[in-house]
């Protein structure tokens, strides 16, 4: 991939999101439709109620359009890019469905958990079919895991889409983390010569950078489940296509720790009737300790950056 193509991809995705996001914000404000705050969430987040959400709508469209025109120009509209774009859009639609219920019904819960889970599983199954149809080699350095690998794909994609969704609780947190995560995979894709994956990662980085000025504290718009579910599933898909599945556990260490904090909190409370942490996901515990959102964001971004750099360096060193 030439510097010109990379630059145009990055700038195109950035500009589409950055220039059109103000119009989307004005539209949602005019409709007086905004984020509903969970009753069990931090009381100090109540002031965020009414903030426009579903910002993921625009940054998903921006990334898809950019991948489309650059891919057509470079002759890279193939199964690999198609699988990644399908994942981004499919999980975005799942999140859009969930967000719409919350917004237009003026409630803090979307559709039922089993409905969301089923939709996520179906999306992952379709990706698995595309994955197999396109003849991608199985991961883990093995030749054929058969149905087990298909089940792993579903588990990985559903798991990380929900992990990123749980992490999206502070202004700008997931936007910054996802940018770092896609940057790490961009390096791996370029080293492996996977230009379609590199194109996708560049488009995602560009669109997230365009979204960040409107999403950092104080956020003018949230990405919503539409954005967070799409980002998590897309990261899982990229890791799968690059055959570095397990790398996401480290590159996405913050998502993993946020999810583990929720699992441990629930398990500990059921066993003892007491809370292990002040509040989960764990970023809320740091808030209750007096940390500002900017401080939490900065520390978590640094952790993500170090984890991403170490993972990439290790993979490149080991060959």
Swiss-Prot record:
Membrane topology: Multi-pass membrane protein
Pathway the protein contributes to: Cell wall biogenesis; peptidoglycan biosynthesis
GO terms assigned for molecular function: metal ion binding; phospho-N-acetylmuramoyl-pentapeptide-transferase activity
Compartments in which it is found: Cell membrane
Pfam families in UniProt: Glycos_transf_4, MraY_sig1
Any single GO CC term annotated in Swiss-Prot or TrEMBL for this entry: plasma membrane
Cofactors, names only: Mg(2+)
Coiled coil: none
Record field: catalytic activity: UDP-N-acetyl-alpha-D-muramoyl-L-alanyl-gamma-D-glutamyl-L-lysyl-D-alanyl-D-alanine + di-trans,octa-cis-undecaprenyl phosphate = Mur2Ac(oyl-L-Ala-gamma-D-Glu-L-Lys-D-Ala-D-Ala)-di-trans,octa-cis-undecaprenyl diphosphate + UMP
Protein EC: 2.7.8.13
GO biological process: cell division; cell wall organization; peptidoglycan biosynthetic process; regulation of cell shape
Entry function: Catalyzes the initial step of the lipid cycle reactions in the biosynthesis of the cell wall peptidoglycan: transfers peptidoglycan precursor phospho-MurNAc-pentapeptide from UDP-MurNAc-pentapeptide onto the lipid carrier undecaprenyl phosphate, yielding undecaprenyl-pyrophosphoryl-MurNAc-pentapeptide, known as lipid I.
Similarity comment: family membership: Belongs to the glycosyltransferase 4 family. MraY subfamily.
Identification of the protein by name: Phospho-N-acetylmuramoyl-pentapeptide-transferase
UniProt gene name: mraY
């Amino acid at each position: 991939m030439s510097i010109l193509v990379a630059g145009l991809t990055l700038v195109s995705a950035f500009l589409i999101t950055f220039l059109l996001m103000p119009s989307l914000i004005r539209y949602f404000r005019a409709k007086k439709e905004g984020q509903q705050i969970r009753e069990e969430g931090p009381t100090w987040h109540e002031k965020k109620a009414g903030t426009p959400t579903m910002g993921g709508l625009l940054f998903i469209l921006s990334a898809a359009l950019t991948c489309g025109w650059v891919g057509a120009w470079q002759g890279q509209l193939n199964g690999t890019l198609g699988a990644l774009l399908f994942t981004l859009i499919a999980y975005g639609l799942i999140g859009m469905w969930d967000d719409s219920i919350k917004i237009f019904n003026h409630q803090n819960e979307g559709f039922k958990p089993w409905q969301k889970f089923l939709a996520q599983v179906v999306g992952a199954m379709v990706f698995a079919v595309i994955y197999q149809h396109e003849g991608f080699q199985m991961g883990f350095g093995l030749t054929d895991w058969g149905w087990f690998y298909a089940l792993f794909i579903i588990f990985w994609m559903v798991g990380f889409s929900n992990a990123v969704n749980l992490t999206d609780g502070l202004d700008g947190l997931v936007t910054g983390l996802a940018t770092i995560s896609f940057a790490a995979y961009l390096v791996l894709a370029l080293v492996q010569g996977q230009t379609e994956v590199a194109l996708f990662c560049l488009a995602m980085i560009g669109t997230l950078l365009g979204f960040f000025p409107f999403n950092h504290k104080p956020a003018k718009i949230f990405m919503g489940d539409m954005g967070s579910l799409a980002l998590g599933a897309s990261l899982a898909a990229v890791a799968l296509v690059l055959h570095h599945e397990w790398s996401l556990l480290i590159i996405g260490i913050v998502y993993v720790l946020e999810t583990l904090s929720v699992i441990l909190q629930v398990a500990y409370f059921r066993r003892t009737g007491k809370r292990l942490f002040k509040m989960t996901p764990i970023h809320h515990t740091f808030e209750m300790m007096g940390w500002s959102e900017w401080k939490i964001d900065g520390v978590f971004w640094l952790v993500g950056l170090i984890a991403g750099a170490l993972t990439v360096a290790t993979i490149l060193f080991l060959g």
